[in-house]
Amino acid sequence: MAELQQLRVQEAVESMVKSLERENIRKMQGLMFRCSASCCEDSQASMKQVHQCIERCHVPLAQAQALVTSELEKFQDRLARCTMHCNDKAKDSIDAGSKELQVKQQLDSCVTKCVDDHMHLIPTMTKKMKEALLSIGK
């Protein structure tokens, strides 16, 4: 049961990341490469100046990648805390003498609720990241 829930979240997050990559990150990569190429075309610039120019071109993409990584880590941490709470409740129930089957059902139900709650956060998280990526790209 938990594996099925994990797969649900994984597929939703992968879909979100693909969408961000296709609609936002890819455009930023194109800008970065074109910007870097123009740095190399300046025949009057020193090697150091060209290097600094290229570094400046990479900044927005690096910021975008850091933003996406940070948001995904926060999401993953929240989901992990929720499922850890479910595990703690299950352990407490076993310690209190509850039947194993009953505890397993409670655990599955709790984990499913965690996943459902976090699946609802994905559209808002996606919107927030897209807005942030657009502001980085400006």
From Swiss-Prot:
The keyword Phosphoprotein applies. Coiled coil: none annotated. The keyword Chaperone does not apply. Keywords: Acetylation, Phosphoprotein. One of its GO terms (cellular component) is cytoplasm. Disulfide bonds: none annotated. The modification N-acetylalanine is found at A2. The modification Phosphothreonine is found at T124, T126. It comes from the Eukaryota. Belongs to the FAM136 family. This is Protein FAM136A. It comes from Homo sapiens. The lineage of its organism: Eukaryota, Metazoa, Chordata, Craniata, Vertebrata. The gene is FAM136A.
